[in-house]
């Protein structure tokens, strides 16, 4: 599904942002990508999307990450941005959702059917004709996920999907992501969400993989997390003294 082999990348005039990254994500896995600010998570996501040209070998959805393969690869990948305003650019949710499928050759009727099916799956049918500027932040985040799913991606990459959400909308987001069968990579500082959704965690620090394994093991390892400037998820931290 996604494989990195000895992948490295440096921004001009700076140290390595990624250094000898190796991992393989298989179909159906739910992977949390964690690390402190500046650890390399965003750069890794950019490499997975083909937005930067890294050294080493990247294979996505069975295709080598080459310039000639990028159009095919990007049709198989879905990316949910941290800021939904940068993703929702049409007047209504419906228009956003049919835009991609129709560009890929579906008829208006087929695109609308796909839109209706996707919104029903997510319990968001009430948002179909909602104007984007009249939605709350949580509604817009959920709509952005629906727009991405309407493209029928084989692999979804998500950047801080729970950021800035109130508790109610965060819970709706988590419940939605848990029931989506598509393979997912979720980059987030929300370790409680990662623990609840993901079965595997990749911990990145200083552009290197510091740990890669079962989410429950890594996120319960207080010494490991603190060594890489992270803390236990709140649900595992216990009572806080006053």
Model region roles, listed by residue range:
Residues 49:
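Helix-to-loop junction immediately C-terminal to a conserved catalytic motif
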Residues 56-65, 73:
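Conserved ABC transporter NBD signature motif
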Residues 109-127:
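Conserved ABC ATPase "signature" region
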Residues 156-159:
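Catalytic Walker B motif of ABC-type/P-loop ATPase nucleotide-binding domains
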Residues 188-189:
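H-loop/switch region of ABC-family ATPase nucleotide-binding domains
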Residues 194-196:
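A short, surface-exposed alpha-helical micro-motif characterized by mixed small hydrophobic
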Residues 208-231:
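Conserved beta-strand-loop-alpha-helix hinge in the C-terminal portion
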